Amino acid sequence: MRLPRFSSTVMLSLLMVQTGILVFLVSRQVPSSPAGLGERVHVLVLSSWRSGSSFVGQLFSQHPDVFYLMEPAWHVWDTLSQGSAPALHMAVRDLIRSVFLCDMDVFDAYLPWRRNISDLFQWAVSRALCSPPVCEAFARGNISSEEVCKPLCATRPFGLAQEACSSYSHVVLKEVRFFNLQVLYPLLSDPALNLRIVHLVRDPRAVLRSREQTAKALARDNGIVLGTNGTWVEADPRLRVVNEVCRSHVRIAEAALHKPPPFLQDRYRLVRYEDLARDPLTVIRELYAFTGLGLTPQLQTWIHNITHGSGPGARREAFKTTSRDALSVSQAWRHTLPFAKIRRVQELCGGALQLLGYRSVHSELEQRDLSLDLLLPRGMDSFKWASSTEKQPES
């Protein structure tokens, strides 16, 4: 049987098409998912400082299917500290995208040439960086400890982070350096990513109380939020940073819940820290289901222990996830903040309180009365939409 013959022109055209397809696929630089695990899931825990995001990050980090990093964009702000938050948005977004794709070369611009795992910000809170293939401190399925991991794993080669990242079905990043949702639209519509956003919010009055305990540690970031061209801001008596944080939460929530773009459907989840404190396992099951994870018995025991400690935790533990009474933590501001400050926060953050479902107090008596529930029921129908473009009180 005679086979059909093709002209050299046709063959060249076919070869060029084949080459073009190959170049396109390679240029996307989409790493394959771990064998047998299906499409990789990317999760961004989007929050602000002192809102319980480190705790939520640990809920993901300790899961055996998750590669987790805490605030990788810290390195962007550390290197470009004279910039403002809006000016740094694109650099932060580009770094986040690269890390989601397990491309750790993106840190070349922000870290020393010779680097170890310990050069990553808060590296030891990542269970994935304390277990194989990075380190042998913990078996891959075990709950990790920052204190144990640090001395054993600090000098491990940085390149192992990329190898570890590529071996997990889920990549989860916690970040506090986005102040609107629109900057993330390119990631949400990126075919290389399968992105879910967990938007964690907390009562602004509780946030203020926690910020006051950690003022020095937040001074540089405060300056970037306020656009001070590199000047650190420790004292903030007019609560300008809290005001901006509240406005950003309103912008993000409105964009996601009020006429969202089609590509955001089923990819955004608003979580209030107070709901998590009241009923940890229910909220965590919902979060895991949203992100395609299962709750193991070992994780369930750890979550119970970490949320049923005694008291709100010591001040020296402000940036650590330790065993505490989660409900006590969420209510601590009602015992400690002067009512004058609470009233000021309510003036500045009225839109956020209304939108996110927090009830205002109108006297010190109401503030101290813990039988008065300040948390409104969850669900869009419970919230009256407040506009982030409304005129804010002068600060």
Swiss-Prot record:
3'-phosphoadenylyl sulfate binds at residues 49-55, 202-210. InterPro entries: Carbohydrate_sulfotransferase, Gal/GlcNAc/GalNAc_ST, P-loop_NTPase. It is a single-pass type II membrane protein. Keywords: Carbohydrate metabolism, Glycoprotein, Golgi apparatus, Membrane, Signal-anchor, Transferase, Transmembrane, Transmembrane helix. Residues 27-395 are lumenal. The chain crosses the membrane at residues 8-26. GO terms for cellular component: Golgi membrane. It is an enzyme of class 2 (transferase). Pfam families: Sulfotransfer_3. Expressed in cornea. Residues 1-7 are cytoplasmic. Glycans are attached at N116, N142, N229, N305. GO terms for biological process: carbohydrate metabolic process; keratan sulfate proteoglycan biosynthetic process; N-acetylglucosamine metabolic process; sulfur compound metabolic process. Its EC number is 2.8.2.-. It is found in: Golgi apparatus membrane. PANTHER family: CARBOHYDRATE SULFOTRANSFERASE (PTHR10704), CARBOHYDRATE SULFOTRANSFERASE 6 (PTHR10704:SF4). In human, there are 2 related proteins, CHST5 and CHST6, the latter mediating sulfation of keratan in cornea. In mouse however, there is no CHST6 protein, CHST5 functioning as a corneal keratan sulfotransferase and mediates such function. Belongs to the sulfotransferase 1 family. Gal/GlcNAc/GalNAc subfamily. Sulfotransferase that utilizes 3'-phospho-5'-adenylyl sulfate (PAPS) as sulfonate donor to catalyze the transfer of sulfate to position 6 of non-reducing N-acetylglucosamine (GlcNAc) residues of keratan. Mediates sulfation of keratan in cornea. Keratan sulfate plays a central role in maintaining corneal transparency. Acts on the non-reducing terminal GlcNAc of short and long carbohydrate substrates that have poly-N-acetyllactosamine structures. May also have activity toward O-linked sugars of mucin-type acceptors. This is Carbohydrate sulfotransferase 5. The gene is Chst5.
